[in-house]
UniProtKB/Swiss-Prot annotation:
<feature type="binding site">
    <location>
        <begin position="208"/>
        <end position="210"/>
    </location>
    <ligand>
        <name>FMN</name>
    </ligand>
</feature>
<dbReference type="InterPro" id="IPR024036">
    <property type="entry name" value="tRNA-dHydroUridine_Synthase_C"/>
</dbReference>
<keyword id="KW-0560">Oxidoreductase</keyword>
<dbReference type="GO" id="GO:0017150">
    <property type="term" value="F:tRNA dihydrouridine synthase activity"/>
</dbReference>
<dbReference type="Pfam" id="PF01207">
    <property type="entry name" value="Dus"/>
</dbReference>
<keyword id="KW-0819">tRNA processing</keyword>
<keyword id="KW-0521">NADP</keyword>
<dbReference type="InterPro" id="IPR001269">
    <property type="entry name" value="DUS_fam"/>
</dbReference>
<dbReference type="InterPro" id="IPR018517">
    <property type="entry name" value="tRNA_hU_synthase_CS"/>
</dbReference>
<dbReference type="GO" id="GO:0000049">
    <property type="term" value="F:tRNA binding"/>
</dbReference>
<keyword id="KW-0288">FMN</keyword>
<keyword id="KW-0820">tRNA-binding</keyword>
<keyword id="KW-0285">Flavoprotein</keyword>
<keyword id="KW-0694">RNA-binding</keyword>
<protein>
    <recommendedName>
        <fullName>Probable tRNA-dihydrouridine synthase</fullName>
        <ecNumber>1.3.1.-</ecNumber>
    </recommendedName>
</protein>
<feature type="binding site">
    <location>
        <begin position="232"/>
        <end position="233"/>
    </location>
    <ligand>
        <name>FMN</name>
    </ligand>
</feature>
<feature type="binding site">
    <location>
        <position position="143"/>
    </location>
    <ligand>
        <name>FMN</name>
    </ligand>
</feature>
Length: 328
């Protein structure tokens, strides 16, 4: 194996969860500006497309990163071990520091085809994929869930994953069936850690699910002795979630992050071709907590260009109180 960056991380370390159509190079840089995590994962990259001579063009943008984001981990999915093998070799050449395998995506058209969380029901294939991915020489990690249908599946499934000698396991503390409709099962963290200690003490354990910020993550790490904390949806409510010394933030700071997002979208649009409308999902992150925010969001949703969005921000900020504090 090439250098294992996982062993050099602080304890506990913090990761921005991979999220489809969210954690691209643009949003990762915005989060980094607000408060940087220790590790970044890419969006989801399909191994079948990556290995196809034509499909590669449709996914390459998902793998765009800059050196200031290191250590960068490529998050990939599929169900053909040979495609994971080839993908891993190419990802190593591209400069990634690690590869993370998606065995937790609950979306129906993924899971029901035996991919993502569907691999929980195909443990032999999951093991083959893990071993095949090691061909690239990068540390291999897995992101998965407690089970597919029932919570009680966790012990057999995670025991099987731990036996594969992986660098890190990120466990979303819900089943595929639960999606994100119930509270994460924090009550299982201790038992999962005990299983890890018994089966694979050298595999790092990262928890994910309902963790809103670094403060909460530190409390869980101290209580249970886990190695890492992954924050996903919490970043939508608080882009400063990874802040080491939390402080009050102003509405203007959020709008400044939106301006940065717009600028970076322009900067990287040649590397990662996306339509302007893909930005709309982000507006609610930055525009809130101030009088007129709802109307501004509505207006931004109807814009068709970066220039239009900037003009609206200029007009809005000319009339706002820059010192209004946020309640995150």
């Amino acid at each position: 194996m090439k250098e294992n960056f996982w062993s050099e991380l602080p304890r506990p370390f913090f990761i921005l969860a991979p999220m489809e159509d969210v954690t691209d190079i643009v949003f990762r840089h915005v989060v980094s500006e607000a408060a940087r995590p220790d590790v970044f994962f890419t969006e989801f990259t399909n191994t079948e497309s990556f290995c196809h001579p034509e499909g590669i063009h449709s996914v390459r943008g998902r793998l765009t990163f800059s050196e200031d984001e290191q250590p960068m981990v490529a998050h990939i999915w599929g169900d053909k071990p040979e495609q994971f093998r080839e993908t891993s070799i190419q990802l190593a050449k591209m400069g990634f520091k690690g590869i993370d395998l998606n065995m937790g995506c609950p979306v129906a058209n993924v899971a029901k085809k035996g991919k993502g969380s569907g691999l929980i029901l195909r443990p032999d294939v999951a093991a083959e994929i893990i071993q095949a991915t090691k061909a690239g020489g990068l540390p291999v990690s897995v992101k998965t869930r407690l089970g597919y249908y029932e919570i009680d599946e966790w012990k057999d499934w995670l025991k099987h994953v731990f036996e594969q000698d992986i660098a890190n396991l990120s466990i979303h503390l819900r089943t595929r069936k639960e999606m994100s409709k119930v509270d994460a099962h924090w009550e299982l963290i201790e038992a999962i850690k005990n299983l890890r200690d018994e089966i694979a003490p050298n595999t790092l354990l990262t928890i994910n699910g309902d963790i809103p910020d670094r403060k909460t993550g530190l409390e869980l790490a101290e209580k249970y002795g886990i190695d890492g904390v992954m924050i996903g949806r919490g970043i939508f409510h608080n882009p400063f979630a990874f802040e080491k010394e939390p402080r009050e933030h102003t509405c203007k700071e959020l709008l400044d992050l939106l301006r940065l997002h717009l600028s970076l979208f322009n900067k990287y649009e040649k590397d990662e071709i996306r339509q302007f409308k893909s930005l709309r999902r982000f507006f609610k992150i930055y525009v809130r907590g101030i009088r007129g925010a709802s109307e501004l969001r509505h207006q931004l949703m109807n814009t068709q260009s970066i220039a239009e969005a900037r003009a609206l921000l200029d007009e809005f900020e000319a009339q706002m109180d820059e010192d209004v504090k946020l309640e995150l």
